Amino acid sequence: MFYRASLQASAALASLSLLAGCGLLSDSGSETDQKITVGTTSSPSTLDPAAAWDGSWELMRNVYQTLVSFPTGSTSPEPDAAESCKFTDATSMAYRCTLKKNLKFSNGEKLDAKAVKYSIDRIRDIHFKGGPVGMLGSLDRVETKGDDTVVFHLNKSDATFPFILATPAMSLVAPGDYRQDKIRDDGKVTGSGPYLLESYEGRKTAELKKNPDYKGFANRKNDAVTIRYFEKSGDMVSALKADEIDATYRGLTAEEVVSLEDNKDDNAGLQIVESTGADIRFLVFNPKDPAAANPAVRKAIAHVVDRDALVAKVYRGTAEPLYSMIPKGIAGHTTSFFDTYGDPDVAKAKSILSEAGVTEPVKMTFWYTTDRYGSATEPEFEELKRQLEASGLFKITLRGEPWQKFQEGFNQGEYPVFGRGWFPDFPDPDNFVAPFVGQEPVTGSPYVNKEITQQLLPASRQESDRGAVSKQFERAQEILVNDVRLLPLWQGKLYIAAGEDIGGGERALDPQTVMQMWELYRKASW
């Protein structure tokens, strides 16, 4: 029978899963190998952590290892490759980690303090545009003490630094296989994570096999995972129904989720696991473009866009309108864009443009990625185009590109207006503001605001109680609303669709909404 599971009921579901059969596999072994096939529309743009600040993390979390990470059920970083980590001073400016003993990479190299330093320094040395180097702004230097101890010296207080180290971008790599000055692009991985990457065919498949030398917190409930990458979510759903894949992650459209839930008779043997998402979608305005650089144009768009209609028509209850760059459920969330711009108001938008001397329809090109966020992205932008042109104030041209080319384009400043999605690096308001401001934001379009970068963010990072930073982030959102360099659209939900014989889906998403493949297993009857 078809059923829908909520992560809020994960404890009960986990118990039911254990009762479902005797074939649950753990790292202690089982009589038969467990192999799982997972489908997704989100293929990696790179296999090198030094270049990854995107959905490539989904694969990296499973084949690399970080010093600290998020065990299932935890929202605070805990040791993984490290035996222990802690701040050694009251100002949160020195973070010391001691490694587990006898760690090694898949090529046999020793994973010691020097390898850790090499991995982190390499991110800064390569300085890949749009990559994770922007996350290391508070890092001054990395010091090794013997083979098993590494100390991160910060240039300012940063209580979020352990969260940063827990991201797949900070994955540890084997120095012998990764150059200090160049991104690795041979389609291979040399890590120390839960799985080995046996083979990889870009945009098609990744074959993972349990790493026999892994030493970390992941209790692997399967022996091998095949990840299939689909360009269209419809093909992915068809493969699920045909038992060609066991589960899907990332890319289901709203229509597909609703169809799977409503047509129970046609979808017997399938289940949906729903997670409250912290992922957001927003527009980015590039100041290199004359129209996008005009504050009046940006504010007029903010007055015209109808989020309720967008969510209702395109996402059908699988998302909700977002009026802040910080989503619901995260400390510091406000409704600042609604408070300022209110409900859609074409007359107000026209007045703003007229006062700025704009009397003709504004011609603009909106760009979006065709494959990163699922098949609904195209109809989403068609709906935005419809709304803006219906106002009589805009003439919109739409352009779509596959993620890799799209990423190159926005990093080179080629797109005047483009859509981005953001899946949090970690569940903290800092991660919904800091990545988008400064000289090297993840959007590729420099957005310098000294009050945010030099006052508000530094003040918030001195506070170890992350629930007590709302004041700074409320002010930051006021600035974002006034500038309208970023326009939040909606906040999503995450869904895993799987065969009814697949367990672990309710535990497979970490706080970064990254799929932990090791949680999936095939149930067996008694």
Describe every region a protein language model picked out.
Residues 39-90, 121, 190:
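N-terminal lobe/hinge region of extracytoplasmic solute-binding protein
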Residues 96-98, 133-177, 199:
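Surface-exposed binding/hinge segments that line
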Residues 141-143, 198-209, 226-289, 312:
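Extracellular/periplasmic solute-recognition and catalytic clefts
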Residues 321-355, 372-379:
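Structural transition elements
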